[in-house]
Every structure is written in C-alpha cells, then in structure tokens.
Amino acid sequence: MHERYPVNGGLAQLIVDQFPTGFMGYGIDVGASDGFSVNTTWVLEKHHRWTILSVEPNPEFHADLVKERAWVEKCACDSKPAESKTFHINLDNHEAYSALRPAMDYIEREQHEGIKTNKWGRIQVKVRTIDQLLEKWAFPRLDLLCIDVEGNEIDVLKGCDLKKWKPEMIILESWDKGTADEYLKQFGYTRVARHVYNDCYLLGVPEDK
C-alpha cells in the first residue's frame, strides 16, 4: 500500500484562473498515479466538473485510480504506440521516478538528497499516443494537457497533434525548468509560470508577458 498525499490545489487553482468562471473543460492527465496524491486534475474533476482522462501504466495505482476518477486508461504514453514495452518502476518511490526511460541523473539526485535507492522493477505495459487516447474516448476538444512522466515529456508531446488539438494550457512536471520551451514554442506556447516542479504553458501568449 503506497502512502497518499494531498492534492495539488495550488496548481489546480492556477489552471482554473486561466478559464472563464464556471468553465467545464476537457483534459488529459498522463502519469496520474493514484488520481489523488499531489494530483493537479482531481480538483478540476471533482469541484469544477471538468472531464478528465487519467492515464497511468503502473498497476499498483490502478485500484485507487478507478475509485477516484471517472475516466481511466491503463497504459503508458509515448511518441509511438506499442502493444508491449518495458516500464521501469523505482521500488523506493513509484510515483516520483518510474518511467519508460528513467533519467540517468535520478540516482545522482537521490544520492545528493541522501535517499537509498537503486532498486528497480520492470513490467510490460501497453503504450498509446495521446492522439489515440483522445480519439478512443471521443474528446470533442482538449483544453488542458498535463504530463508527469519523469523526463519523457517531449516524447509524450510528440504523440499529440498540438496543431489539431490546440489545448489552451499545458502543464509539464519537470525537475529542471524550461526543458520543453523550444519544442512548444513552435506550436505557439509560452511558459508563463513555474509552480514547484511544474512548468505551465499557455497558447498564444506573448513571450514578454
């Protein structure tokens, strides 16, 4: 049984503030874990009546996720789909480090923070692109794209046709600030805020704003 933590209400409010009062949007949350702990979209779904697709490949979180959230997809996301791909699970911290391709600097970060790690499990998971999931769940539009995939953000973004969907806001969890700035700039996105480890991007906002 993993430990649960409070939802990320501060970031949820930042998102809500970008839309008209009472707006009920459509969003996808890639890397949703249990759907509650430090989760950005829980508040949107439960208190603002947004429609959110919660995506998570780790089976440990699945039972809690389906209890917490209305729409759930058990898979990983990447630039291309696959019926079976190795997913690496950090046995010391399933939520913060597990990924299709774990970043090599995690071990260095853990050593710096005094955390004993180097314990990894591996499972096979289904992989889908964001485009495939939006089509499967018949999204009429996409207002919010949230991605928390431990260093694989660009690969996941490449699986979403941003020119077609044009989400108003994109939230990327990233240890380092601005790692997706250049990639998203070509689609008209500007990073407007940094909330703890989350980069927040808006569509069509001038860079100097």
Identify the residue ranges that each predicted region occupies:
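Phosphate/nucleotide-binding beta-alpha loop and adjacent structural elements of enzyme active sites
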Residues: 1-209
